[in-house]
């Protein structure tokens, strides 16, 4: 297991999970206010969605967005779990680019989203020497 530190461009807002519904929505207690946030992960997230779990949201100031907040992280059993599926490749790219993944250190080439065949795409192509 790796501990990759990822920095967000905006400050995360801490709250308590109330519930998730309709796959895309979570209600969160922020101080004395209850807000509805966008849930970017439509998977079951079994074991993460317990009422009262600590969650971290990002505020979005885009007036075109229907919801002001987006769910980024859930704390479950002392672990912080990133739940925004849009961040997965950014986190891996950060780890590769900064030599944080020991098995893949000191690469000469890192290319995201490489097509090998017409319908086969890899998230990353990593090259070191002739490998």
Regions from the language model: what does each represent?
Residues 15-17:
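Conserved hydrophobic positions within beta-strands
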Residues 19, 59-64:
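Short, charged beta-turn/beta-strand-edge "cap" motif at the junction between a beta-strand
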Residues 22-27:
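Short aromatic-glycine-enriched beta-strand elements
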Residues 35-45:
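Short alpha-helix capping/helix-loop boundary micro-motifs
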Residues 43-56:
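Short nucleic-acid-contacting surface segments enriched for D/E, G, S/T with interspersed K/R
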Residues 46, 80-110:
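Acidic-basic catalytic patches of nuclease active cores, encompassing PD-(D/E)XK
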Residues 62-79:
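OB-fold/S1-family single-stranded nucleic acid-binding modules
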Residues 80, 84, 105-131:
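Active-site metal-binding core of divalent-cation-utilizing nuclease and nuclease-like domains
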């Amino acid at each position: 297991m790796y501990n990759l530190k990822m920095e967000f461009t905006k400050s995360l807002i801490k709250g308590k999970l109330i519930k998730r519904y309709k796959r895309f929505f979570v209600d969160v207690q922020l101080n004395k206010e209850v807000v509805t946030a966008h849930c970017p992960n439509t998977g079951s997230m079994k074991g993460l969605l317990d009422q009262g779990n600590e969650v971290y949201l990002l505020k979005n100031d885009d007036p075109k967005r229907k919801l002001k907040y987006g769910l980024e992280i859930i704390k479950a059993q002392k672990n912080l779990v990133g739940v925004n599926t849009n961040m997965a490749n950014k986190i891996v790219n950060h780890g590769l680019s900064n030599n944080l993944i020991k098995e893949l250190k000191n690469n000469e080439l890192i290319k995201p989203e490489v097509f090998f065949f017409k319908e086969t795409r890899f998230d990353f192509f990593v090259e070191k020497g002739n490998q």
